[in-house]
């Protein structure tokens, strides 16, 4: 499909710079393409009323790390140059894939000293060698530190990598360290938050428990590639970024049991959906799964396991708007976004949410 078919105009003032307080007071647009009235306006705290006892919410429990690093590049003894790197996928105890700026001036073999003005952190120098250079500013960094010691060093000098549409308007601050993290995050490794999960509060969890809604947790480490623009003119020519994660045998069995009892699988966020669909066979059975997924979902895709999706409002021309268009219908989602814009919904990571029913007709 032509990528420009997924374009729409979004006024700048619709981009949320801070989350709603409390989190579950955010607005919730319910989209049911097969209902007589496809769109209805609610709040996230109303979520239990749209679910049934025996349904299962699937959350992504990845935890955002301070993956934005600033440093000084050194080459052949020459003077240093300021560079930045956003880590996006760990490929070994001491090696990370990253997006570096300015990418054109970085070469294989360069040494980069990360930290404030290239200084050492308390547990040692956070230095790395550019091991490999790829496309679009992507590099492979081999750090001198390894394992938990490397993790500690990154935590000491790194910054939360706010999405570019927020970072362009204000700097990251201490509040973001809490705001840009779900309350159930536990598996470190994400560069971006699974933002649909940001709306959940202890009070909402309690209400869901009382309604008999199950909670299941999977892990997909969201990478910086989620913010990369689609540069191709046709979806067939777009290469999807890879993200690593896993579905345990216990979770797979639990979700299959939910389906067998007639319950629905409700994914909280596109990351949970992409992971569950990667783990599902053609019959819809979910199997234990671990690895890197590059699943790219566009209209025409047949969903195998997921029945409902809770997700925020996405960028024009993005792979995520393509995904929701595949899930609830191309025309329905264009109408939903037009409604959201005209009625003041807040967009993107800190914005409001939508609850989507899968289009079956």
From Swiss-Prot:
Keywords assigned: Cytoplasm, Queuosine biosynthesis, S-adenosyl-L-methionine, Transferase
A GO BP annotation: queuosine biosynthetic process
Pfam name, any one: Queuosine_synth
GO terms under cellular component: cytoplasm
Pathway: tRNA modification; tRNA-queuosine biosynthesis
Acyltransferase among keywords: no
GO molecular function terms listed in the Swiss-Prot or TrEMBL record: S-adenosylmethionine:tRNA ribosyltransferase-isomerase activity
Top EC class for this record: transferase
Cross-referenced HAMAP family: QueA
PANTHER family membership: S-ADENOSYLMETHIONINE:TRNA RIBOSYLTRANSFERASE-ISOMERASE (PTHR30307:SF0)
Protein family (similarity comment): Belongs to the QueA family.
Quaternary structure (record): Monomer.
Protein's recorded name: S-adenosylmethionine:tRNA ribosyltransferase-isomerase
